[in-house]
Every structure is written in C-alpha cells, then in structure tokens.
C-alpha cells in the first residue's frame, strides 16, 4: 500500500485549482480559456506585460510540495547530510528520501522594456517518482540534488503515490526543526490564490446577470493586471517605475552615508537601527557588562549582518515587551546642556524562552554563543597585544641594536616604575647625577 502525503487533503477533491501557485498550473492558460468562452468570437487582446521569450523547461510531473525559489545569484542549492526532505503528514521517516529538481523559469519584460530572467525554483520529488523516477539515489544529473533522512533506505524507491493535481492540493514545504536552509533561497508560501483570477468560474456563469458578466470580461481583457505566477519581480518593477525610482541599487557615497548616519542618530535611542552606515557603537556605545552582545563583525554591520535575521525571530513583540517584562520608571538628573528638561528612564527586565524544537535552533545557539560577551575576548586580545609594542622606526634610518635595547629597556622600566618607593626614587635620582671626580686637597 502506497503512502499519500497529507492524505487528508484528498477529501477536497472538488477544490479544482484552488491551490493556485502551489500547483504548477499556468494561470495565463486559464485566462486564455476564459477569453475563448466569453469573447463572443473576438480576437483575444495581447497581454502587454508577458514576455515573448520561451516559458522555460516544462515540469512534466507534479510535486507534492511548494517550491524553493532562489533570490540571490551565485548561491548553491544544498542541504546538510540527513536534511532537506520536507515533512508531510502520513509519511514515515523510512520513506523520507528523494531529490530536488531545478526548474529554469521564464523571463519577462519590465516596465522599461528590458528582459529579466527569473531565478530558478526547485521542487521535491520522492525517490522513484517525478522526472527522474528511473534514476537511482545519488546518480549524477545536472540540476538534481539528492536528500534523505538517516532512517531511509536509499537502495529502493520510496513507496509514495504520485500526486493527482485535480483532487490533491500541493502541501506548503516545511522542514524538521534544526534544518539549515540554503542561503539565498526562500520557501514559497500559499498566500496567493488562483480563485481570484478565474473570471469564468461556475459561480459567475450562473444566474441572469450574463450581460454584466460580459461587460466585466470585456474590461478584464483590456487590463494588463492579469495574475500570473512568478510576478513578484514584475510587480515590484512596475511599482518602482510608477514612484519614479530605479530598481537598480544605487551607489552610496560618503556624503549619503553621513546623511543616513545623522538621520539614525537623530532618533531616540530606543528607535535606532544600527547598520553598516551607522554601526552598533555609534548607536548604543561601547560593549560592556550592561551591553554585552555583538562580536566585531556584527558590531560593524548591525542589522545588515547575515546572521541577524535569525536572531530577530527571538525579539519580543511590543505586547510581550510591556506585558511580559518587569518595568520600572526612574527620573534622571537633568543634563548640563538642558537643565530645564526632565529626563526619565523606563528600565525593563525579562526573558525570552525557547527550546530545541524552534526552527533553526542549532544555528541560533551558534550565533548566540559567538556574540554573547564577545567584548571580553576582544578586550583580552587588545591587552595582550599592547603589552609588547613593536618599536617604531623612521623611514630611511637604520637603527642599531643598541637603540632597540634602549627601547626595550625603557618599556620595561615604564611597566615597573609604578612599584618604586620614595626611597627608590631618591636613589635613582642620585644615580642619574653626572659623575664628578673628587678633588685632591
């Protein structure tokens, strides 16, 4: 008996195409079919925002899961050993084996007429299913990455049935806690639905309002806002063009960086967001017992540090801050610059609790250990490096060995001079007096 991922979804056999983007059906094809039904013989209007480029390699099989999309160029798609198999209700760990298939997507035309190639998207198929159903686990294929759990036997195909897209919806991709996702990729969600983009549904075709339906379809044909998959980049470019902004990253000059830093520092301390233009020390001061988080790299980049987003998942919400913390109000002494201004401090203390089931737990623990009290090790390295300063030498002047000895001697004397008693100082003063021979009477 074959296993069926999320077999409870099979009861929704009448859902049709409700899964939208999670099922790799073409919404453009759906809209074209609806035009053929309601256009009364008229020629379909061209879709001005659709590229004439090829649509990319087709997906001959339907994956059980939503895809993983690349959003940063030059990033490799990979998972650590034993990770990378999506979890699904009804599938035991012994069947958690398969491969990720790279789907090269189409290009589209931006608002300024340029062609932009979408980055690829990856789909998961169980071992023995999908476009490489006949391949054995580990076979070398371009655009294929094999994954399996430690409990799975990869020598035999998985006993998982194929997905019928007409009665079975795709499952949002989720991974077991601690899974490290490929950098530069994000998991596709199920927020967008195709139901809103189907003007020819049965609920609309029924009833006496066929004339209004015809008029709405006529307006629909002339609209270039047809919902199509993979339109996030296209929509963003249209919005930026409407706002008069260039979607290409602008080069930040020193003057711009200075303005950004000034704008951040003008905000109240609790509203500042440190970044690579205004670092942590500039926003909140040096590290110490009361501000003990951040290593040298994170202090320099602030929230632009690649490790910061996973830490932000631990940050409390405003509600948790006020209602889950101990708050105390104190009045501070007025500053000398503004003696007439009353200054108050709202001091807080609380805790953030999490366990090993939190997604990315191992990565979070690693980042926390690297940044908690990192200033202590930094200070120790600074002190150890300053105990034996390297003597400075002038350019073009060759120093003799005697000069190096005198420099080292003066450095040693400087470190031990604080231990001298007043008697020792008087004795040294006597020794420093020039030698004068005794006169002969």
From Swiss-Prot:
Binding-site residues for RNA, renumbered to this chain: 105, 121, 163
Record function comment: Packages the positive strand viral genome RNA into a helical ribonucleocapsid (RNP) and plays a fundamental role during virion assembly through its interactions with the viral genome and membrane protein M. Plays an important role in enhancing the efficiency of subgenomic viral RNA transcription as well as viral replication.
Family under the similarity heading: Belongs to the betacoronavirus nucleocapsid protein family.
Modified residues (Phosphothreonine): 173, 421
Keyword hit for Transcription regulation: yes
Localization per Swiss-Prot or TrEMBL: Virion; Host endoplasmic reticulum-Golgi intermediate compartment; Host Golgi apparatus
Low complexity bias locations: 11-20, 189-220
Keywords, comma-separated and alphabetical: ADP-ribosylation, Host Golgi apparatus, Phosphoprotein, Ribonucleoprotein, RNA-binding, Transcription, Transcription regulation, Viral nucleoprotein, Virion
Post-translational modification: ADP-ribosylated. The ADP-ribosylation is retained in the virion during infection.
The encoding gene: N
Domain CoV N CTD: 257-379
A GO cellular-component term linked to this record: viral nucleocapsid
Subunit structure: Homooligomer. Both monomeric and oligomeric forms interact with RNA. Interacts with protein M. Interacts with NSP3; this interaction serves to tether the genome to the newly translated replicase-transcriptase complex at a very early stage of infection.
Residue ranges the record marks as coiled coil: none
Stated name of the protein: Nucleoprotein
Signal peptide location: none
UniProt-listed SUPFAM superfamilies: Coronavirus RNA-binding domain, Nucleocapsid protein dimerization domain
Superkingdom, natural source: Viruses
Region Dimerization: start-end pairs: 264-382
Disulphide-bonded residues: none
Segments of this protein annotated with the region Disordered: 1-56, 186-226, 380-408
Modified residues (Phosphoserine): 158, 190, 388, 417
Region (RNA-binding): 53-193
Species of provenance: Human coronavirus HKU1 (isolate N5)
Boundaries of every CoV N NTD domain copy: 60-189
Record field: compositional bias (Polar residues): 380-389
An MF annotation (GO) of this entry: RNA binding
